[in-house]
Amino acid sequence: MPSIDVYNVEGKKVSSVDLKEEIFGIEPNEAVVHSVLVNFLANQRQGTQSTKTRAEVRGGGRKPWRQKGTGRARQGSIRAPQWIKGGIALGPKPRSYKYTVNKKERRLAIKSLLSSKVLENELTVVDAFNFDSIKTKQMVNALTNLKVEGKTLIVLADKNENVQKSARNIKNVKTLQVNTINVYDLLKYKNLVITEDTVKKLEEVYA
């Protein structure tokens, strides 16, 4: 069972916490992570692209010239695909790119990435963010004290407006709650900062 130090927002070690092996200590499964990431990105696509076929563009109702005798190639409509302003042949139409992946796969992908953060020393556990007001500076100071630099994902156990709004104007810092944690953000952000309550909730949800 992996153990990790717990710090306060001043950057001082206050305790340590044991992490459940089945969530924070498994062998990362890259194939499953990739599969779930592709699914996540596909589900973000709007799929609103659209083109008009020759039946939908305006004009072209009559034959532009007679079939024979002009010396020109035969044409049936000035809105056929080969014409300028003609309809598009086999063009994209609105569609949904959404599909589902197995719930076990999604859970395994999250656990793989949490374990990866532990293995690569990219996980920081804080006792709590007890902010009594919304101030960007206090979050900047907390991250500086914790020696967390670069892209950082802060995952909270529950909604905390003071913490979330204190972090939202800091470049390369994002906050999520346990119920919205996802593969994309765990991969995008190098550092993962969580509270002791978050550890408990993750172990409760993913056990």
Residue spans of the language-model regions?
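Extended polybasic, low-complexity segments that bind anionic RNA or targeting/receptor surfaces
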Residues: 1-46, 91-207
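A short, flexible low-complexity segment enriched in Lys/Arg and Gly/Pro that occurs
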Residues: 30-68
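Glycine/serine-rich anion-binding loops at beta->alpha junctions
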Residues: 54-90
